[in-house]
């Protein structure tokens, strides 16, 4: 198993999907460490957005790691990558308000993601979606599976 400074090196590929935006959604993640691979997916039958599903994929993948790790997280979402690497510090400083003083969308998930990231050393890598990257294609297929399962689940009453 690859390690750095005693920490496991993990490659994560994430993706989110949504039908209707808002509508039912799904997320998927592929975690690779050494010779091991783990796939995660899930969905939301109620009204959600593609951005919420992208965030959820990253959160679930990072929360699945059982110990602090060195992570390379690959995403096709510029919203996710820019949010966590650039915008989040300002949002936190402004009390989770945008520069226009409006509430940050998905603040609940951004805060959860920030907590999940704190345990790890994470490098955020953007990949072009639907361009043949094997990890992204697999994460996309898992997100589609999560969406399909969410469509078959009745929304909460």
UniProtKB/Swiss-Prot annotation:
Mg(2+) 2 binds at residues 15, 140. Binds 1 Mg(2+) ion per subunit. May bind a second metal ion at a regulatory site, or after substrate binding. GO terms for cellular component: cytoplasm. Its main location: cytoplasm. Residues 136-157 are annotated as: Disordered. Residues 6-148 form the RNase H type-1 domain. Mg(2+) 1 binds at residues 15, 54, 76. The keyword Cytoplasm applies. InterPro entries: RNase_H, RNaseH-like_sf, RNaseH_domain, RNaseH_sf, RNaseHI. It is found in: Cytoplasm. GO terms for biological process: DNA replication, removal of RNA primer. It catalyses: Endonucleolytic cleavage to 5'-phosphomonoester. Keywords: Cytoplasm, Endonuclease, Hydrolase, Magnesium, Metal-binding, Nuclease. Its EC number is 3.1.26.4. GO terms for molecular function: magnesium ion binding; nucleic acid binding; RNA-DNA hybrid ribonuclease activity. It comes from the Bacteria. Monomer. Endonuclease that specifically degrades the RNA of RNA-DNA hybrids. Belongs to the RNase H family. This is Ribonuclease H. It comes from Frankia alni (strain DSM 45986 / CECT 9034 / ACN14a). The gene is rnhA.
